[in-house]
Amino acid sequence: MSDKDNKTVGRRNLLTNLGVTAVAGLAGAAVATPARAAQSAGFEPARHGNDAWLGELAGSHRVFIDSSTLEGGANALRFASNIIKSHIDEYEGKASDYAMVVCFRHGSASYGFGDALWAKYPAILGRGIDPAPTSNPMSTANAANGQNSIDSMVKDGVHFAICKRSSRRIAAGIAEATGVTPEEAFAEIVAGAIPNAHFVAAGVLAATRAQEYSYSLLYSE
């Protein structure tokens, strides 16, 4: 056999071996993929009483809008309204079709506090806003929130997740400024929260737990 013939046979053997390997790989993938799918389908997240309210909100669609800044908190109202109005206009739906949660955490946490608290502690709650407002800026429909407000959101059935860790940080500032204990200040915050408020262990934690209850997650900037 000539050198040319030897090279031809060698190439054929190589291609044959590669073909066998590829088929074996595809067969392995065909076997492994259903196994992985079954593993994923079999996952059931642990349930906790603190999160039960997420599963109790009525609606055929679930959305969790997260925010962590003053601007993001205002836009969260805008986005919640846009979703609901678009659903009504384009899908012939209604606001009650949505289990909608807006999260105020970190820099937007004080939006979860009612007007009486803002009137009492404007410099603390309005930190970063000049001049410091004496009522919750989200109590009024304005350009920042797309002409929506806390009350208009509540009328549409929207609920609010308020970060407890951020609220406790603010309570510590109130305690330092007024001489009450941090626990007393935090209790006042909880009592003076906006309607439909749920104080969650941490806003970031609530955002992850909401997804375990099949909420779509949107971050508002």
Predicted ranges, named:
Residues M1-V9:
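N-terminal secretory signal peptides
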Residues V9-V31:
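N-terminal export leaders
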Residues A29-H61:
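C-terminal segment of N-terminal export signals and the immediately downstream linker at the start
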Residues L54-L70, R127-I129:
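Acidic/histidine-rich, surface-exposed loop or edge segments in extracytoplasmic proteins
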Residues N75-E92:
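Histidine-anchored nucleotide/phosphate-binding helix
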Residues G93-L117:
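Acidic helix-start/capping segments at beta-turn-to-alpha-helix junctions
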Residues A116-S139:
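A charged helix-plus-loop insertion that forms the helical arch/lid used to bind
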Residues P133-E221:
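A cross-taxonomic marker for long C-terminal extensions/tails that follow the last structured domain
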